[in-house]
Amino acid sequence: GSSSSASKDTLRVGVTNFADSLEPTANYFGWQVMRYGVGEALVHFDDKMRPEPWIAESWLVAPDQMSWTFKIKNIKFSNGNPVTGEAVKKSIERTFAKAPRAQAMFPLDHITADGQTVTIYTKKPIATLPGMLGDPLFIIVDTSAEGKQDFDKQGPISTGPYVVKSFSKAKTELDANPNYYAAVPYKHAVVNTIDDPSTRAMALQKGEVDVAVNIAPGDLALFKDKSKFTTSEIDSIRDVLARLSVKEGKPLADPRVRAALIESLDRDTYCKVLLKDTFTPGGPALPPSLDYDFDGLSKTYPNKYNPEHAKQLLAEAGWKDTDGDGIVDKDGKPLSLDFVYYSGRAELPLFAEATQADAKKVGIQINLKNVDYNVLDGIGTRGEYDLLISNILTEQAGDPETFLNMYWKTNVNGSNPQNGSGYSNPAYDALSDQLAGEFDPAKRRDIIIQMEKILQDTSATLVFGYPQTNMISTSAVAHADIKPCDYYWITDKITPASK
């Protein structure tokens, strides 16, 4: 079938793509490898974000809690090599050798393999280890294929339903994996990078793609005709949030200035009007789709929209408009904040521009800086911002521990590189340490809620809202369902519609 019209053989998908490489250990590129149906991990997440078997059929923690043993299914890599305990061991060791982020997730001691089992020993007890191994960073690859295949350009040899035929940032062509352990619904798939949301919607309307991921709020109405389109839409487990740089010398180092900034912003209106009710307005650090007392935390949330109080807080912090230009100043310097954003997601520029307009009303100047997604990570780790917005998964291991640590646990000499903000709170760190060793789910939940309370009471972060997420497909396709977990787009569940 030609790639320009619908065919039973070829699935055509329109996506956003930030990856210019398919090396799963580089940056966050493993996400695309998994989203494209090429890579799989030991563990998969169900619709409530609970770990379930994938390459591993079962797992068990040792009585001393210092190791976990995984039993590996008898399956093959796409090149026909068997997925053995030893192959899994080498793949995880490769991730640790190449990705500093792995070490930040859990402290590996060593790994042993025996037949179809792998035992992972950690330097301290890790309650969420199975979930962590569901992260795309830990896609299981055939390390013996390195050198024969360029993982960067051709993708890794893994176990997913599809293999990479050709890859560029703009377009990826996939073929069915001949060694997949189940039926692969399509012979081919074409993934088109269409970063502009309205262009993505247009491609779906015109029938240039069969499936599109994350259609913008303003375009959803175009796909209401159920005879032509199926809309799969759910509450995501994401936050759109701005990290706030609280480093010494930065204006936001003062908690009163942080509170004033947050209280100057009418998030209800942004989510209801600008984003046409496809977002729940922000507050607590974790979204309402997760079971962490969202309602209780919302009730006690201190920085609700209150521009008059925001002005008062700025005055208390010594910021006054002495020269009548509408911007408050202190020691001869205006209160001017750099807001870094990228345009790959429709809502980010909207939130950035709305922030600029509302903050100005209380005397805060916001300078908007639009950057490419690929430089965002570096800007974040170096702390080169006052506000840095992103659309972020709050559970990266079926549990929010990694997320809560990544941005707000104290970064001691590079111990937590993702926290470039300078945020450091001893009570928060103590709870984080306690959480790391807690295996009881009810107690974990309590600790996490306490951590959230500290974040909101110290105005540590600005959560704009919690997005819904969607996948829309044409009538040529069946079972194109979006999952709460954002790693699964092209799966073996998406099939041609039976006519």
What are these regions (language model features)?
Residues K320-E395, T469:
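Ligand/substrate-recognition segments at binding pockets and active sites
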Residues P281-T322, S343-L350:
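Structural transition elements
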Residues R50, G134-V184, H188, P307-E308, ...:
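Gly/Pro-rich hinge or "lid" segments in bacterial periplasmic/extracellular proteins
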Residues L265-G296, E347-Q356, G380-K499:
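Detector for C-terminal structural segments
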Residues D64-S67, Q103-A145:
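Surface-exposed binding/hinge segments that line
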Residues N177-L222, E353, Q365-N367, D372-Y373:
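Ligand-site clamp/hinge motif
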Residues G14-P63, K71, E93, I157, ...:
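N-terminal lobe/hinge region of extracytoplasmic solute-binding protein
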Residues E57-A99, T119, P251-A253:
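Aromatic- and charge-enriched surface segment that lines or borders ligand/interaction sites
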